[in-house]
């Protein structure tokens, strides 16, 4: 698009275009993901076993061929399935670095939240699919390489100043998630206050002269997160 809609907006638009175009599945990847030749085949072998499967994600390596710590699925279980030599185990949440999502799941739970702009859209979306009752899987036989500059996420104590804005989105988006999962308004506000307190403490450990930029970002993120409640877009059946 001509407008910068962020990673979240791009994923949301991509899924929408794929599903409305008649696709049964959408393979979501970061722009720095390099799939192995049989990565998609392993995903499809798993995803097509049942209509109850919402998504299947890949094993993600870093450029040195070690497991990428940012992209290990959450909620892994010993419950496994097998098809044509491809084995997969249950999981609950994953990143968008390489995940195959069924259109059935998209029609039921809606699109990824484009208003997130960046960060946490993948965790929110895959957990939404899991909570809708779909069975989701991780297969180590679908392998991709995630060519990030560093193997770990930049933390707020050391991140360069040009990333301060990203921590605004991270803070605001996680506040939204807490709001959705915690219906008690008092407990929700207490959790946001505690989050801000922890972030301030971490920012104060910075060794450079850019503490204020990060403090401003997370304060605004917590403030906006109190009222940030975007509507989920559903596709017409």
Language-model region placement:
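Glycine-rich, basic loop-to-helix element that forms the pyrophosphate-binding segment
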Residues: 1-21
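Non-catalytic, C-terminal membrane-associated alpha-helical segments of glycosyltransferases
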Residues: 183-237
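Conserved donor NDP-sugar-binding/catalytic core segment of glycosyltransferases
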Residues: 36-70
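A recurrent flexible, glycine/aromatic-enriched loop bordering the glycosyltransferase active site
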Residues: 82-101
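Short beta-strand-to-loop acidic/aromatic patch adjacent to the donor-nucleotide binding site
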Residues: 23-32
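Active-site donor/metal-binding and catalytic loop motifs
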Residues: 139-159
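Acidic donor-diphosphate engagement hotspot in glycosyltransferases and nucleotidyltransferases
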Residues: 11, 38-42, 121
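A short, conserved alpha-helix in the catalytic core of glycosyltransferases
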Residues: 99, 105-110, 115-142
